[in-house]
Each structure stands twice: as structure tokens, then as C-alpha cells.
């Protein structure tokens, strides 16, 4: 794939009244893009909040083709923290693998996702993904991920603080979720199916294993 460069400045805040981040990247455009590019991986993205008044939260990413979920502990629900994870993944996987796995990401209009430029471009100003946004108040448009969050809530019910969570315990929880066998996957787990459908360097880099 040809690497594209573009000069840009990273922002740390975006006005909630400023909807320019959605320009040409709404749900309608998302449907048009995946219809024209049927082989792309589609990833749904969201955050899961802890107890009210606490800062830590989870960033979740869900591969539609195999139901594999990624989950990262954020210190706070901010654009800066989400960008930190994107930059970390880019460095860990390499720009070409990141582009392959995360070509298209669908998310909501949360303030932590509104700096589209910092997510779409790497620190070296290389295009790494395309971010699209659900229509306002239409979380059902990324309903597969919303449904998958129920597995998190089985262990950490709504209102539970994530302040005692660590990267290690987050990964442990995630590995158990991804190893849960699903009727929707013909009795297989997301982990098993993802080993067949996704580049296994993703599993190797992020230490994904199937708990025994």
C-alpha cells in the first residue's frame, strides 16, 4: 500500500458544538465505503465508563468479521488517551499491519473521538485508518460492540469503579471474554475464529491467548 503523508497539528480538545469532524464521515458515508470495499475489516469502537466521578475507563474495539474484541485501560476518557492507544498500536504492529487491520473504524460522537485527524494520522503523518461516525443517538449502528459489552458488565457491573484495574487484569478479563464460545460463531470462540480470519501478528503482539 502506498504511504500517504499529510502535515497536521494534534488538538487536545474539540468543541461539542463543532460537528465538522463528521463532515463526509457520517454513517451514510460509512455504508457507501464498505459497499464499495467489501473485503475491508470493519472495526467498531467505543468506551466503557466506570463509576460516576472516577476517571479510568476502557477503550474497546470490535472486529465484526470474527467478534474479537480489543480492550485498553485509559487513565481518563479523553481524546489524548485514545490517541495514545492508537499511537501505541501503530508502533507495536507497524504502520502497514495497522492499516490492514484497522482500515475502517466506526464509532460514536463522543468527545474522546472527535479529533479525527489525530486518530487517522500517525505521529509520522502517515494515513493509518478511516474514522466514521454513527448518527447521533444511534448506538444500535454499532450494536455488535454494544452487545459485547455485556460480557464486561458480567464481571464489572455498571457503577463499578475501574480504579483498581491494571493493564494486566484488563488483558486477563479480555482473554476470558474472547474465549467464550458463541452460538453466533457456530460454537466457536472469537479467539478461535480470529486466528483464522485475522493476521496472527495481532495476537502475538498483544499477547492474546486462550485461557485454559
List the predicted regions and their residue ranges.
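Basic, flexible linker segments flanking DNA-binding modules
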Residues: 1-35
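Acidic/histidine-rich, metal-coordinating catalytic segments
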Residues: 99-115, 136-137
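Conserved small/polar residues in nucleotide/adenosyl-binding loops
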Residues: 208-212
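Short small-residue beta-strand/loop micro-motif enriched in glycine and branched aliphatics
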Residues: 67-72, 158
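Active-site beta-loop-alpha junctions of metal-dependent nucleic acid enzymes
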Residues: 51, 71-96
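An active-site-proximal beta-strand-loop segment
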Residues: 23-66
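Charged alpha-helix within mobile-element recombinases
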Residues: 121-122, 128-207
